Regions:
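Alpha/beta-hydrolase fold catalytic core
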Residues: 1-36, 58-60, 100
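Active-site loop/oxyanion-hole signature of alpha/beta-hydrolase fold enzymes
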Residues: 16-18, 25, 51-54, 64-106
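Serine-hydrolase catalytic-loop signature spanning alpha/beta hydrolases and amidase-signature enzymes
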Residues: 41-51, 62
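Alpha/beta-hydrolase active-site loop signature
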Residues: 43, 67-71, 136
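Conserved hydrolase catalytic core segment
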Residues: 101-142
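A catalytic-pocket lid/entrance helix-loop region that shapes and gates access to the active site
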Residues: 132-161
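Alpha/beta-hydrolase
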Residues: 164-220
Length: 220
C-alpha cells in the first residue's frame, strides 16, 4: 500500500568496534519486489529523496537510508570508520534485510561512491546504477570547500535561517523555490539550545555527527 509519508525502520549493522543502528525510510508497497535504493550525499540524509521517492512509490518499493552518523541513525565511536568501506558493509546488511535479490541504486555524491563500490563487488545486488553529482574522480577543490562547513559548529534560531545557510552552500545545484529550500533543510535539523545574553536560546543544529569530518580532513 502506498503512503503519503515514509515508514521509518532500523537495521543493526556491525563494525570493527561493535554494533550500530542504521535508519532507513521506506516508501511504497513493502511486498513489491521492485526496489530502488536512494543514498544521499556526505552531510545529508534520506529525506532528501522525498519528492523522487513519492513519485516512484506507485511502481517501486523505495528505500532511503540515513547513512550512519546522519539523520536518525546512530553515531560511530571511532570517527576513522566513517568511510566507504563501512558504508558499503552497512548497505549489504540493509539489502539482506530487504530480502530481495536485486535493487536499482540512485546515489548522490557520497551515495554514488557507495553505489560504485558496491556495484563492483562480485555477486552485487545492483542491476542499475544512477549517479548524481559524482564520478570516479573527486575534483581537487571539493574537499577544501566541504571543510568550510562540514563539522563546523552551527546554530540557527529558525528554519528560515537554516534554509538560507543551505542555499548558500548548495545554490549551485540548480534553481529551487524558497519552499523547496525549506523542505530540503527541515530534515537536516535537530532541536538545540545556545547561551544568549538573556538565557538559553532555542533553535536548531545540524543532524549529523560532527566527527564525519575527521576522515575528510585527514584526506587533505
Amino acid at each position: 500500500m502506498n503512503t503519503p509519508e515514509p515508514r521509518l525502520h532500523h537495521v543493526t549493522c556491525a563494525s570493527p568496534v561493535g554494533l550500530h543502528r542504521m535508519a532507513y525510510w521506506e516508501w511504497g508497497d513493502a511486498a513489491n519486489p521492485r526496489v530502488v535504493v536512494c543514498v544521499h550525499g556526505l552531510s545529508r540524509q534520506g529525506r532528501d529523496f522525498d519528492t523522487l521517492a513519492r513519485d516512484l512509490s506507485s511502481d517501486y518499493r523505495v528505500i532511503c537510508p540515513d547513512v550512519v552518523g546522519r539523520g536518525r541513525s546512530g553515531w560511530l565511536p571511532d570517527p576513522r570508520l566513517y568511510g566507504v568501506p563501512t558504508y558499503v558493509a552497512d548497505m549489504v546488511t540493509l539489502v539482506a534485510r530487504l530480502n530481495v535479490p536485486e535493487v536499482h541504486w540512485v546515489g548522490t555524491s557520497m551515495g554514488g561512491l557507495i553505489g560504485i563500490a558496491l556495484a563492483a563487488q562480485q555477486g552485487t545486488p545492483i542491476t542499475r546504477l544512477v549517479l548524481n553529482d559524482v564520478g570516479p574522480v573527486i575534483e581537487p577543490g571539493f574537499i577544501p570547500r566541504v571543510l568550510g562547513y562540514l563539522g563546523v559548529p552551527a546554530f540557527w534560531r529558525t528554519l528560515e535561517e537554516a534554509a538560507e545557510a543551505t542555499w548558500a552552500i548548495s545554490r549551485g545545484f540548480g534553481p529551487h523555490t524558497l519552499e523547496q529550500w525549506q523542505a530540503l533543510t527541515r530534515h537536516q535539523l535537530v532541536p538545540a539550545e545556545q547561551d544568549g545574553p538573556a538565557g538559553k536560546l532555542s533553535g536548531f543544529k545540524p543532524h549529523y555527527d560532527p566527527a564525519i569530518a575527521v576522515p575528510v580532513r585527514a584526506a587533505t
